[in-house]
């Protein structure tokens, strides 16, 4: 008996030693493994680092980051919304973080760009560490490990933390997770010193996170939701002492977060001041509820859970009712900015509503199977079951468990709202994936089998889970390497923008479709002011779309009011032309994206490549054939098994027109036009078949209006092309045809000889009337003007009703002749912030009605001018065409832009080349804006949608516009 007892004791000691060794190994090895995976996460995310950024918005963030390094806390960005610039709308905390990171890594030789490329992968590295710490705090070490492993290779997480994507949601989430870990330790810790440290970290990290992203209200709402639920649950279950302890610890910390966060809104480090005020009001409501909970027992029945629950329910319902009455429907629109219902936002993919296909793609392993997401659901069920069991059996509401449940629930709510939140939810999904595996490992560890069997089971489970990173990491790496070769480098944008940078004035402006505005502005590329980009002047998107998608007079936009110099056409925008056509009013909502069942959607433009006698697009399964039958030709478009006949086909060269039936072999309509060139076939929906994009992108001179194509090509002159990018110089006033009166006959000429001429000039005024203008001819040798000849005047010419002008001129001997129109027009770009009475104001809306004061401007010009300074109003609005409401599938929206001068502020201002500082006393008349708004509302009623109202400072000078340059030829006649 004694011997057997001794053996049992020895075996017990041996088991204890094995268990202690196992625990020690786990505590040491798991953190090492996590650190290794975090480094691997950094490696994967840094594979995208190259010359440029794969994400277009990051070009803008890079520019503001450089301004922060240069100026500290800048307020103004001069390159957007040309020629005015814009206030910086993003929180400066987003840029202070990588700027601080640069200060550290610059010690090791990294420059500004290299540090900026390192920053997002470093955020990814931190995110992996943060999820590990949160997982081990919520459940166990295994949870932290497997959450970190999954986050390392999560496509959803990679999508916002790869090098070249420096948006704010990445650093916000990493900081918020660290803050949450600090909060949970703070609430648990009993040691006073450590409690102060954790509490300080909680407040500090949360406040910093508020400055990282304008979506940071998510963090405040998670914390407030957690606090509200914990307060209510502890009260209902009668845990008043725990409630008092929780209130004493959490409430002051949350109040400090709101106070410090709001204080940082004044220097612009945090930009969610309105939401902080709202959160404070909700927090006051929670405090009011708390007071009733703690002190209402004197008057209310708190005898049991049912009565306490009833009291809370009534008060909460009353609170919601009061909040709804105070705030309105937007009470339920948490993060509503992510899914705003405007026509522009409808066309932005990342703001679209999330589908199950998106979830599967972003949370898939090797393919779009959504495995990571679906394995997080058992984690939710496990933790929810554990929480409810502890709550109802032990009256215990664990901070860690409740917080994790609130975090996951609110993350999934946002994931449901918009595609962009697939990233934000990646942390919660990884955490609950880890909870599922961590719980399974915990079950194995607590089994009664010997440690060898348990270890074997644990190893098998671990190997099964390790399949995820081993299988998906190579997929992610291939995607990352593909992203490194950016669209800029392979399409011609790099060469075109560097040409623009080298061959135009530093004050020149350019535009394209808004997606490319940040490339135009970037100091790495164009370094020129852009009229529209991905974050500014969103009202102008409709005007750009109107120009690109339409034809004829309606498409004539007053680009001169934007002081536009260059328009860049990207041939690949045919793939975006559904969105462009919709925003430009060319097609209806149904034609853009289909009805509720997806029916009615059209493809506006499709390209095919010439291959012998046919034109092929293998991806769309389309073949265009030119069929010769006897002496006639017909065009057949094969779509799968269908054969269709377009309404019209036009073959170039020769402008040969071939009419068709506009129907397919099954009798369905086929409302398309086909253009065939030697290398390319263009299939265009009939509503956009003559659009300006078709003209400028493919050089097809098509229009529904006589001579409009010729006019357009005179106003937009190609000056550079590389790959799929064409740079056009914009001329507001141009001559598209010159006729010379020779021997009693008008003859069109392309050259002019020295001597006397009677010329008929066909003028195209694009989007702007000619008023009190003078016509000149400059005779040039090279770039030197040898003679300036006045040839005529134009008192007024409506840009929609141009007519030819007859002039008499005697031309001297010269190499070429430049025709000039001189009339008043805008000049200058703002180079610094606009101040009214010393305060920086919005440069595109500088004064309100009835406001007056000292106006300070900085304006840059290329040469000397004498200018008058005006306040000008610009209204950009849509008028619904068709449909009974704005949500009707048959509705289309026609863009309009109206401009008018409000008042002259000062005349005779001397502007010199370079930057000029101008100070004037300004006064904005009353009712100048409101009266015009009322006029539009009266005219259009509920069909009116105002997209932008501007009050802009404009310098008006006598300005010379080049209309055409013609080469000289040898003298050969005299005019009669």
Swiss-Prot record:
A motif (DXD motif 1) lies at residues 55-57. The keyword Ribosomal protein does not apply. A motif (WWDYG motif) lies at residues 513-517. The keyword Transmembrane applies. A motif (DXD motif 2) lies at residues 167-169. It is a multi-pass membrane protein. The record marks 160 as: Important for catalytic activity. The chain crosses the membrane at residues 22-42, 113-133, 136-156, 166-186, 194-214, 216-236, 248-268, 270-290, 307-327, 361-381, 397-417, 419-439, 454-474. Mn(2+) binds at residues 57, 167, 169. Pathway: Protein modification; protein glycosylation. It catalyses: an archaeal dolichyl phosphooligosaccharide + [protein]-L-asparagine = an archaeal dolichyl phosphate + a glycoprotein with the oligosaccharide chain attached by N-beta-D-glycosyl linkage to a protein L-asparagine. A glycophospholipid binds at residues 420, 518. Keywords: Cell membrane, Glycosyltransferase, Magnesium, Manganese, Membrane, Metal-binding, Transferase, Transmembrane, Transmembrane helix. GO terms for cellular component: plasma membrane. One of its GO terms (molecular function) is oligosaccharyl transferase activity. A motif (TIXE motif) lies at residues 347-350. Its main location: membrane. It is found in: Cell membrane. Residues 43-112, 157-165, 215, 269, 328-360, 418, 475-976 are extracellular. Residues 513-515 are annotated as: Interacts with target acceptor peptide in protein substrate. GO terms for biological process: protein glycosylation. Residues 1-21, 134-135, 187-193, 237-247, 291-306, 382-396, 440-453 are cytoplasmic. Its EC number is 2.4.99.21. Oligosaccharyl transferase (OST) that catalyzes the initial transfer of a defined glycan (ManNAcXyl(2)GlcAMan(2)GalNAc in Pyrococcus) from the lipid carrier dolichol-monophosphate to an asparagine residue within an Asn-X-Ser/Thr consensus motif in nascent polypeptide chains, the first step in protein N-glycosylation. This is Dolichyl-phosphooligosaccharide-protein glycotransferase 1. It comes from Pyrococcus horikoshii (strain ATCC 700860 / DSM 12428 / JCM 9974 / NBRC 100139 / OT-3).
């Amino acid at each position: 008996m004694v011997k057997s007892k001794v053996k049992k004791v020895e075996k017990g000691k041996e088991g204890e030693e094995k268990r202690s060794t196992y625990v020690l190994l786990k505590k040491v090895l798991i953190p090492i493994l996590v650190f290794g995976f975090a480094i691997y996460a950094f490696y994967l995310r840094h594979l995208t680092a190259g010359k440029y950024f794969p994400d277009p918005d990051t070009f803008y963030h890079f520019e503001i980051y450089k301004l922060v390094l240069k100026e500290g806390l800048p307020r103004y960005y001069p390159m957007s919304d040309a020629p005015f610039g814009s206030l910086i709308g993003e929180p400066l905390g987003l840029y202070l973080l990588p700027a601080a990171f640069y200060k550290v890594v610059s010690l090791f030789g990294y420059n500004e760009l290299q540090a900026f490329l390192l920053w997002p992968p470093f955020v990814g590295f931190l995110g992996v560490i943060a999820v590990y710490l949160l997982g081990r705090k919520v459940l166990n070490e295994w949870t932290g490990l497997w959450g970190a492993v999954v986050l390392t290779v999560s496509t959803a997480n990679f999508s916002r933390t790869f090098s070249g994507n420096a948006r704010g949601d990445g650093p916000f989430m990493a900081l918020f997770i660290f803050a949450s870990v600090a909060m949970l330790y703070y609430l648990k810790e009993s040691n006073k010193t450590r409690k102060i440290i954790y509490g300080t970290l909680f407040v500090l990290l949360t406040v910093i996170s508020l400055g990282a992203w304008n979506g940071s209200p998510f963090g405040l709402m998670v914390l407030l939701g957690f606090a509200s639920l914990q307060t209510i649950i502890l009260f209902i279950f009668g845990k008043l002492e725990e409630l008092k302890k929780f209130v004493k610890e959490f409430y002051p910390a949350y109040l400090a977060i709101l106070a410090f966060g709001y204080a940082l809104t004044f220097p612009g480090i945090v930009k969610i001041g309105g939401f902080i005020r709202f959160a404070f009001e909700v927090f006051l409501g929670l405090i009011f509820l708390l007071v009733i909970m703690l002190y209402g027992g004197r008057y209310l029945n708190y005898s049991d859970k049912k009565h306490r629950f009833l009291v809370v329910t009534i008060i909460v319902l009353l609170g919601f009712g009061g909040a709804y009455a105070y705030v309105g429907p937007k009470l339920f629109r948490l993060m509503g900015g992510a899914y705003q219902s405007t026509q522009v936002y409808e066309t932005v993919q990342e703001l679209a509503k999330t589908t199950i296909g998106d979830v599967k793609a972003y949370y898939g392993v090797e393919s779009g199977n959504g495995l990571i997401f679906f394995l997080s659901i058992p984690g939710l069920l496990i933790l929810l079951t554990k929480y409810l069991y502890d709550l109802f059996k032990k009256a215990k509401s664990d901070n860690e468990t409740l917080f994790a449940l609130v975090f996951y629930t609110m993350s999934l709510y946002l994931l449901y709202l918009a595609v962009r939140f697939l990233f934000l939810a990646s942390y919660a999904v990884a955490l609950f994936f880890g909870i599922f595996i961590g719980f399974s490992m915990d079950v194995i560890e607590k089994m009664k089998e010997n440690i060898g069997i348990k270890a074997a089971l644990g190893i098998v489970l671990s190997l099964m889970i390790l399949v995820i990173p081993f299988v998906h990491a190579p997929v992610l790496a291939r995607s990352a390497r593909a992203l490194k070769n950016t669209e800029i480098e392979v399409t011609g944008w790099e060469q075109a923008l560097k040409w623009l940078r080298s061959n135009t004035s530093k004050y020149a402006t350019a535009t394209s479709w808004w997606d490319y505005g940040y490339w135009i502005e970037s100091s790495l590329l164009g370094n020129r002011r852009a009229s529209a980009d991905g974050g500014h002047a969103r009202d102008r998107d409709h005007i750009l779309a109107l120009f690109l998608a339409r034809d004829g007079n309606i498409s004539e936009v007053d680009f001169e009011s934007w002081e536009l110099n260059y328009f860049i056409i990207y041939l690949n925008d045919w793939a975006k032309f559904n969105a462009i056509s919709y925003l430009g009013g060319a097609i209806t909502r149904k034609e853009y994206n289909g009805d509720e069942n997806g029916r009615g959607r059209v493809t506006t433009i499709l390209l095919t490549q010439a291959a012998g006698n046919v034109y092929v697009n293998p991806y769309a399964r389309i073949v265009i054939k030119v069929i010769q039958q006897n002496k006639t030709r017909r065009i057949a478009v094969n779509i799968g098994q269908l054969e269709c006949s377009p309404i019209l086909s036009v073959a170039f060269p020769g402008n040969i027109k071939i009419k068709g039936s506009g129907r397919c072999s099954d009798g369905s309509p086929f409302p398309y036009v086909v253009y065939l060139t030697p290398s390319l076939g263009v299939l265009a929906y009939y509503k956009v078949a003559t659009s300006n994009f078709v003209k400028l992108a493919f050089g097809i001179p098509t229009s529904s209006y006589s001579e409009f194509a010729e006019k357009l090509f005179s106003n937009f002159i190609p000056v550079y092309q590389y790959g799929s990018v064409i740079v056009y110089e914009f001329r507001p006033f141009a001559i598209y045809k010159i006729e010379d009166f020779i021997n009693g006959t008008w003859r069109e000429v392309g050259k002019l000889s020295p001597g006397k001429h009677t010329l008929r000039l066909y003028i195209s005024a694009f989007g702007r009337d000619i008023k009190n203008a003078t016509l000149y001819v400059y005779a040039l040798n090279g770039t030197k003007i040898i003679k300036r000849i006045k040839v005529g005047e134009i008192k007024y010419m409506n840009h929609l009703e141009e007519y030819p002008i007859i002039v008499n001129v005697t031309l001297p001997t010269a190499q070429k002749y430049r025709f000039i129109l001189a009339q008043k027009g805008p000049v200058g770009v703002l180079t610094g912030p606009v101040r009214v009475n010393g305060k920086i104001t919005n440069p595109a809306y500088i004064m309100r009605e009835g406001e007056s004061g000292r106006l300070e401007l900085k304006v840059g010009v290329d040469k000397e001018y004498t200018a008058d300074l005006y306040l000008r109003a610009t209204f950009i609005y849509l008028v619904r065409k068709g449909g009974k409401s704005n949500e009707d599938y048959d509705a289309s929206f026609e863009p309009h832009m109206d401009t008018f001068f409000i008042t002259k502020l000062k005349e005779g201002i001397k502007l010199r080349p370079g930057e000029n500082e101008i100070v004037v006393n300004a006064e904005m008349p009353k009712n100048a804006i409101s009266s015009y708004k009322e006029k539009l509302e009266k005219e259009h009623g509920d069909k009116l949608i105002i997209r932008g109202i501007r009050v802009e400072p404009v310098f008006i000078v006598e300005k010379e516009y080049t209309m055409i340059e013609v080469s000289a030829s040898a003298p050969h006649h005299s005019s009669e």
